[in-house]
Each structure stands twice: as C-alpha cells, then as structure tokens.
Amino acid sequence: MKIIIVQSRVCFGGAEHVGVMLANALAEYHDVVLATNTQLEVSYAISDSVKVRNIFPSIPHGVRKWTGAIQQLRKLFVQEKPDVAIGILSTCSFICKVAGVGLGIPVVATEHDAFERPESAPMSRGNAFSKFWLNRLFDVVTVLTEADKQVIGNRLRRVVVMSNPLSLQPATVEGRNEFKDAEGNTFAKKPIVLAAGRLDSWHYKGFDVLLEAWAKVLARCKENIEAEGWRLCIAGKDEVDGLSHLQSLVRKLELGDSVSFLGFRKDMVRLYQEASVFALSSRYEGFGLVLVEAMSQGCACVSTDYKGRQKEIFGDAECGLLCPPEDAEALAEALQSVMTDATLRHRLQKNAIERSRFFMPLHIVKLWEQLLSEVVAARKK
C-alpha cells in the first residue's frame, strides 16, 4: 500500500511521536510518506524508508498557514496517489479530507484523547463539535480505549480501538533492584518518583494534585523519605507560565528541594530507568503513553484512572496502583505504599515490564495493516 501520514510537526507531543512510530513501522513493508512541517525542530528519529515532505508554508500560524497546507497536501495527493491517508489529530485529519475532495482517497482519523471530560475540565464546544460531528466525515476514526468507543456509540461511521505503540524495548529483571536494557547494560533504580508532561498543561496533567499528594507523603514519612533520599522529579516543556505556577505551589506547600523540574528531556529512557516509581496524576487522560513507557523500564506505576482508561493499560496484571482523579489523599496513599514497601514495589516493577510487551509496535502495526487493508478494499468496491 501507499500510505500518507499527515501531522503538523514532529516534535514535543505524544501524538506526534506516535505518528512517527507508525510511519517507521509501516515503512518496513509499505510505501509511506510523512507530510508535515519540516521547518520545525525534529525531536523523533524518522526511518530512512519514510519519505518526508513539507506541506506547510513559512507562516507561523493562522488561516493562511492551514490553507497553504491544504493546497500543498492536495498537490502531494495528486503526485503520490496514495491508497489511504492517516490524519494525526483532528486538524490534520480534517485537512486530509478537504485536500482529497474528488480524489477518492479514504481518510483514517486518529484521536488521541478522551471523548469525555470531568466537570473540572469540561470539553469545549469546538472540541465536542470536532469529535462528534466532524469525525462523521471520515471512513474510520481510531480511538485509544474501549471506554471511548462505548462513549461514542453509533454516532460515527466506524470506530476502531487502536492502542498507542511502545517505542522502547522493555527491560529485563536481573535482581531485586537490578535491571538490564535491550543492549545488555545493567541499571539500578534510585529513590525517585518521576512524572512527565507539558508544564503549561499542569491542570490537565494534575500536577497540582500530585504536589499536594507529595506534601501529604512527606508529612507522614518525612524521616524515612529524607533518610532514603526520595525525590519527586517532573519532566516536561514549559512555554508560558506553567513552571512559575508550580514553583509557587512548591513554596506554598513548603516542599523545599524534594521536588525538581527537569524541563523537556530527550533522555526520557534514562529517567525511566533511574526512577523507582512513575506517577500519572491527570484529571483525564485518553491513554497515557508515558505510563506504558515507564512500565517498560521497570517503574512501579501509580496512576489516576479516568473512567477505566488506565485500567485498560494495566489489564488484569498487578503492575500498578490506581486511584481516582483529583483525589490527593488517595494518590498520597498509593505513593506511600510503593515508596515504603520494597516487596510490593519490586512485584509491580516486574509485572509492569511483562505487561508493556502487549504494546510492542509489531503487535500494533499488524492491527493497523489489517485496518488499512479493510479501508482500501471497502473504498474500491
């Protein structure tokens, strides 16, 4: 098959990372073109087998940027004559549909967040319109969980659950606190609780709740935590004022130097390998690829569970502790359990690695190949 994958950038985003991973995996057996903005930073490794094409004009933002992208994408469609196009996130899915008018190219739209929201972070009207109305334009819409498929019901043409693929090779357990990576290098865990996400999205990521929970843990186990050297480290890019807000909260809660903000990091694998515990504190989360990545490197995971979505990641395996979103007390209790009980922590770490293998690209790309073949065959009938 000839496949064109369209995304707005190849940096600073989980969905964008998934788009690149999908392009790389499909390019092993198919002709794949990645249409994107090559003028921006490239954060993710792109296979030499993937043809990369720029479709964005040198305009930073606005209507002209997107109309220019539509024009260039249509030219690319005419030139390449793809069997199918995949849009990464709603805007790129939409421009695929507009650019392909009259060309008979089926479009698969990919959604990367939840189709419902908590009252504390309601879905905007524009987002709801995109998810439940614009998505009716597409041959297929992929979602990340069965929970989202249930929310959608029969409102769209066809909905398929497609988990995000894992980009990392799972580690192996060598001893109680000793692990080995895919290259055979051993690493040991440190007394670190790691969290990751864009700091400007602190409310969505629940970093305020995480800091409140951390304060509770420190208050209850201060001597033990200080003796063992436990720290909370938050990795993530800051573009506006997320960092300053969170730093002020650290001061208010008197957390001192027990919390570190690491900024955007390209060495996330090393951070996962160093961390004994990974915390996902989101108020809502469509999937949580960072959770799977952390599991693969032997982190004992503590996660909020937004209406069953993160429970789907853990499956039936005992590989992490779940708690309700926006509940600092429950999050604190879970963190305290894995930090103070080494036997529990090691069991969760071992099981997490095994569960992460379900999300390996080979498994996910087979599901994608089957879906794309069905979409192409249906359009040719």
Feature annotation, model-predicted:
Residues 264, 283:
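Aromatic "clamp/platform" in nucleotide-sugar-dependent glycosyltransferases that forms part
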Residues 300-304:
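Short hydrophobic beta-strand element within catalytic cores of glycosyltransferases
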Residues 330, 337, 344-358, 370:
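A short, well-ordered alpha-helix in the C-terminal region of glycosyltransferases
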Residues 53, 136-174:
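Donor nucleotide-sugar binding/catalytic pocket of nucleotide-sugar-dependent glycosyltransferases
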